[in-house]
């Protein structure tokens, strides 16, 4: 009984200490290499069979809790160093905010939205989203029968736009100023600094056609009951601008994006 009791006590205290984590053969991956790297570099007992040390050099094995604490500490140190580097980059710019080049690199997705293009030459095609919409319509038409496809063609059905509009790419030379979201007039920068030089800003604007047939009113509206007018509407896009205080930055400005019909009911009839 005494021997059994001593065996149970030894087993109990042995379970209180956890062996260090090791990668199982054939199970190495990104998770084990990234998060268990600290366990591999943690001090191990030199008397283990894996190390080949002698019995007199045996040390205590680190517990599972100590191993994870070390991993967490290393992750926090890496995060702190990254934050410190980011603060140092901001201070090196004189505290005046990020430069246009840094902002352009960090927000390159925003620069190529549906109606803004940063390029060294005039774009030859409409924005990508417009082309994707046309391609989708082409795929929809390809799945139709020949008869249905003929009747779905707007020209065959006699469909006409209520208001005639024109769309074209313009630059800051054509659009020198604009209105931002705060209602202030800002100057549109013609060129955007990039690491390899400068690129121009292009805006894809859509407005009512002054030479169209709807300059005197919307098409298809009963003039006996309504007074109609085709008007150009605007939307906000992001562009590199300069305010009245000579501060350059990325702001949302208004550009022409569509031509719509406005109606007014004639009263007294």
UniProtKB/Swiss-Prot annotation:
Residues 1-18 form the signal peptide. The keyword Disulfide bond applies. Residues 19-150 form a propeptide. Keywords: Cleavage on pair of basic residues, Disulfide bond, Glycoprotein, Growth factor, Signal. One of its GO terms (cellular component) is synaptic vesicle. Residues 39-61, 82-104 are annotated as: Disordered. It comes from the Eukaryota. Glycans are attached at residue 143. Pfam families: NGF. Disulfide bonds join 163-230, 208-259, 218-261. One of its GO terms (biological process) is modulation of chemical synaptic transmission. The keyword Cytoplasm does not apply. GO terms for molecular function: growth factor activity; nerve growth factor receptor binding. Belongs to the NGF-beta family. BDNF promotes the survival of neuronal populations that are all located either in the central nervous system or directly connected to it. This is Neurotrophic factor BDNF precursor form. It comes from Xiphophorus maculatus (Southern platyfish). The lineage of its organism: Eukaryota, Metazoa, Chordata, Craniata, Vertebrata.
């Amino acid at each position: 009984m005494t021997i059994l009791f001593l065996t149970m006590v030894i087993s109990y205290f042995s379970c209180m200490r956890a062996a260090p984590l090791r990668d199982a053969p054939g199970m190495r991956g990104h998770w084990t290499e990234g998060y268990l790297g600290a366990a591999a570099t943690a001090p191990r007992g030199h008397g283990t069979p894996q190390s080949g040390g002698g019995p007199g050099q045996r040390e205590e094995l680190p517990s599972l809790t100590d191993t994870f604490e070390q991993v967490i500490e290393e992750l926090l140190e890496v995060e702190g160093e990254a934050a410190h580097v980011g603060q140092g980059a901001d201070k090196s710019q004189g505290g005046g905010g990020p430069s246009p080049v840094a902002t352009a690199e960090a927000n390159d997705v925003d620069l190529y939205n549906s109606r803004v293009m940063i390029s060294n030459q005039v774009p030859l095609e409409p924005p990508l989203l417009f082309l994707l919409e046309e391609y989708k319509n082409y795929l929809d038409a390809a799945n139709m029968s020949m008869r249905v496809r003929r009747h779905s063609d707007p020209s065959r059905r006699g469909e006409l736009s209520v208001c005639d509009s024109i769309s074209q790419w313009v630059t800051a030379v054509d659009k020198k100023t604009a209105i931002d979201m705060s209602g202030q007039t800002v100057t549109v920068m013609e060129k955007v600094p990039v690491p390899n030089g400068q690129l121009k800003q292009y805006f894809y604007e859509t407005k009512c056609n002054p030479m169209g047939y709807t300059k005197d009113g919307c098409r298809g509206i009963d003039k006996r009951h309504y007074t109609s007018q085709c008007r150009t509407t605007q939307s906000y896009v992001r562009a590199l601008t300069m305010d009245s205080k000579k501060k350059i930055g990325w702001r949302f400005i208004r550009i022409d994006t569509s031509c719509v019909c406005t109606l007014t009911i004639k009263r007294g009839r």
